[in-house]
Amino acid sequence: MIGILKKVFDVNQRQIKRMQKTVEQIDALESSIKPLTDEQLKGKTLEFKERLTKGETVDDLLPEAFAVVREAATRVLGMRPYGVQLMGGIALHEGNISEMKTGEGKTLTSTLPVYLNALTGKGVHVVTVNEYLAQRDASEMGQLHEFLGLTVGINLNSMSREEKQEAYAADITYSTNNELGFDYLRDNMGLYKEECVQRPLHFAIIDEVDSILVDEARTPLIISGQAQKSTELYMFANAFVRTLENEKDYSFDVKTKNVMLTEDGITKAEKAFHIENLFDLKHVALLHHINQGLRAHVVMHRDTDYVVQEGEIVIVDQFTGRLMKGRRYSEGLHQAIEAKEGVEIQNESMTLATITFQNYFRMYEKLSGMTGTAKTEEEEFRNIYNMNVIVIPTNKPIIRDDRADLIFKSMEGKFNAVVEDIVNRHKKGQPVLVGTVAIETSELISKMLTRKGVRHNILNAKNHAREADIIAEAGIKGAVTIATNMAGRGTDIKLGDDVKNVGLAVIGTERHESRRIDNQLRGRAGRQGDPGVTQFYLSMEDELMRRFGSDNMKAMMDRLGMDDSQPIESKMVSRAVESAQKRVEGNNYDARKQLLQYDDVLRQQREVIYKQRQEVMESDNLRGIIEGMMKSTVERAVALHTQEEIEEDWNIKGLVDYLNTNLLQDGDVKEEELRRLAPEEMSEPIIEKLIERYNEKEKLMPEEQMREFEKVVVFRVVDTKWTEHIDAMDHLREGIHLRAYGQIDPLREYQMEGFAMFESMVASIEEEISRYIMKAEIEQNLERQEVVQGEAVHPSSDGEEAKKKPVVKGDQVGRNDLCKCGSGKKYKNCCGIVQ
């Protein structure tokens, strides 16, 4: 009865039935596709593209396109996709996850939806976990796509920008998940649209989707650079600030805590540092350091805002009076205070750009994936990525023997039993794969086998270079392979002809905290209907057993007088282990979900900044945008200085000083003129004067150069402020969980404070751009420059050394090359004229 109900209500079964009908349609088309010549078969691609332009959809083309790919695969690769592979292809095309067991031909399955979706010309990304697999699949499956007239590209870390652009321009691009994410970040740090490599993200198929979207979900991709805050500059700025006098060299507004140099102060700085114009773009860093030095000396007070403890500056929480250890002021203020107090100035590395795989892959119009094990994480895929997991039936029934776990009292007893089992199977010639959780376990078993005289291969992080060769040999007679955490996914273990009747034996030395990893190990045996056996050996001293109350069981084994050589084989124990694994999986899912909620705050901000950066990059004239920024800056300044209810308390002098110092020239705006106006009327005459000055500035140089100058300023300011903001958000995130002690929801606080910080950053960007546009002297040979040269850092989740990938740098411009400013002239006759 239960079986019947299960069939009626089984959603997966319903999906399979629905797809079976489409498979029958594809089969029916075979008789008309098979007689076609190679040229006629290739011609189908053009026909499909034309039909798409006339209004048909890819869904309409699916049966015929799949039939064409099946026939082409038979001719080019000598492989004909089975019906279950067609089902897998349909599930992928619909934006779902195809769970297909090991050896069922996932790579061939992917060619069906890849071809269909590549017909749109928008690009399809096939994502793999490492470059070896990307190259293998691109060369093998690429033959099929190229036969059908589509272009195939491969995107590798070592490639130049031009090679990457070519790879992404292809109809189908094979790449690793890391490289896709880093290219996205680098594109959004670029200064010229010609430097960008990616097209809009259309459709991705992720191989081993659980590994990328679940196991690596919490690992952010980071491009970081040494923060260009030389400690030396802090020392110089600090020494200079000590010589300044209040009122004469700087003005301090107690209410707004705003401190800035006066004209005298600016002149003093220019003399002290032997420069002509403090507001020149070349001196951005110097001005920033002086301003932060001023804030450190005038605004920040020892034992009120911070304390000096054990040679470190520790912030004091203004609300609770508690010390906030580990928190640092952003934008270099912390280093300025360190210089003021004479303690060691810490040089921070700065995150220039960051994104998690969760957020990167959610940007695709359509996303799908394939793996042998995804059903256990179905809830996560559905809730976070909006993908259903469809379990595709195997082509032949699975006849593998999955035996119940054997539980030993101690680790020693367990390993002795494992080695004995391996030796016995090795004598019979049966190939054995031993799965371990840690590298040290694999090396311990290796030593024990060496003592017994059993030849074997070890596959772990230390020798992954030979991964493919070791896996290829693992199915031959008498082979013994020890693999850590199922390294070598993506390559099948093919059985030698002389062991086809016994199959592969898989031995697990302990249960992983995730059932999925155990299932991956099991799935190595019994591929494509082959025989095979799987057996897990556990001990009461294993981490999972220790964490989830095995004391009772240990006591029971003692009472029964069981020694190390006697295991217990019990369904009850297996169930207890499985429920422990479910609990751990639940905890991990909650952690990933929480990470996503926090990361979403930065995601929304990142999308706003990157979208505006893109607009700036593609825009020919930023004048309108900059005028809008000036208007906002003036309105904010007016509001700040006239916020008191009583007119006499308005700080009109402060407003005039601010405008003359930052935006206008002395005498452009007079105090008595503004006093006659209401606050809402003050902005208009100021903005008119600003535009007048802007027009004068434009007349001083050619139009092209003015436009490039605007872009230089906007990029420099936006990128500097954005990287500082990411840094500040990092620091906010580190300490936010402590708010929970005050009965406050940390996530809500993070969202609110993050939004306030973002608004403050936008205001700061607008103000600084306005100031540089109005005050900076313009040089003839302006060039856009990256704020910081970054390098890609992908923190390794398994504690190995972090992988570092350099940002691809642009080529040097030759004197006879076209100028990068977009003028159409040769470099020597344009921006290179002065050099």
From Swiss-Prot:
Q: Name one GO biological process term.
A: protein targeting
Reaction(s) catalysed by this chain's protein: ATP + H2O + cellular proteinSide 1 = ADP + phosphate + cellular proteinSide 2
Gene Ontology MF terms: ATP binding; metal ion binding; protein-exporting ATPase activity
Subcellular location(s) per record: Cell membrane; Cytoplasm
Q: How does it assemble?
A: Monomer and homodimer. Part of the essential Sec protein translocation apparatus which comprises SecA, SecYEG and auxiliary proteins SecDF. Other proteins may also be involved.
Q: What is its main location?
A: membrane
Q: Specify where the region named Disordered lies, as residue ranges.
A: 788-807
List the record's Gene Ontology CC terms alphabetically. cell envelope Sec protein transport complex; cytoplasm; plasma membrane
Top-level taxon of the source organism: Bacteria
What's the protein name?
Answer: Protein translocase subunit SecA
The family database entries (PANTHER family) matched by this protein are listed as: CHLOROPLAST PROTEIN-TRANSPORTING ATPASE, SECA INNER MEMBRANE COMPONENT OF SEC PROTEIN SECRETION SYSTEM
Cofactor binding: number and manner? May bind 1 zinc ion per subunit.
Q: Which UniProt keywords are listed?
A: ATP-binding, Cell membrane, Cytoplasm, Membrane, Metal-binding, Nucleotide-binding, Protein transport, Translocase, Translocation, Transport, Zinc
Give the species this sequence originates from: Bacillus cereus (strain ATCC 14579 / DSM 31 / CCUG 7414 / JCM 2152 / NBRC 15305 / NCIMB 9373 / NCTC 2599 / NRRL B-3711)
* Chain residues that bind Zn(2+): C819, C821, C830, C831
Please give the cofactor(s) recorded in the UniProt entry for this protein. Answer: Zn(2+)
Q: What is its EC number?
A: 7.4.2.8
Q: What does this protein do?
A: Part of the Sec protein translocase complex. Interacts with the SecYEG preprotein conducting channel. Has a central role in coupling the hydrolysis of ATP to the transfer of proteins into and across the cell membrane, serving as an ATP-driven molecular motor driving the stepwise translocation of polypeptide chains across the membrane.
NCBIfam families under this entry? PRK09200.1, PRK12904.1, secA
Top EC class of this enzyme: translocase
Family membership: Belongs to the SecA family.
Where, by residue number, does ATP bind? Answer: Q85, G103, E104, G105, K106, T107, D492
Topology in the membrane?
A: Peripheral membrane protein
